[in-house]
Amino acid sequence: MLKHVFTKTLIVAAFLMGIAVTSQAAPAQKICPLMIEDEIDEEEFVVYKGIKVYTCCGTCKKLWSQNPDYYAVVSVEQAPQLKAVASKTIKPMAQRFCPVYSDTRVHPKSPSMEYKGKKIYFSKERALTRFKANPTKYEKNLK
């Protein structure tokens, strides 16, 4: 009987320690990892390798699904909970944001075009079309 109570006590203690460690592992996420000027909506999230990653909208959830491994690597600042699961082998591109929607991330599979001898990435086809219509307007956003 005493052994049974002791075992249950150990299980409960281990469970509570696990919760404490998990809750202290990373600061709370406040900013969308893909549209980095927007706050998260707690109803809009994806689960990446068992970790909840909040986004600002359904559009960002769809965007995340296009290249989750890459986005996990470049989004650690906005979503610190990703640090433990983000790839250590994926390297971020030099261009991180769309020149048209300058707060929105791009990835290696994003729509792209050659411009002045350089490959430029866009968050979506509409952004690429806008850039083609007036590239000088968006050149300043090419970082």
Segments (PLM) and residue ranges:
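Bacterial N-terminal signal peptides that target proteins for export
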Residues: 1-11
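Intrinsically disordered, low-complexity terminal tails/loops enriched in metal-binding residues
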Residues: 21-143
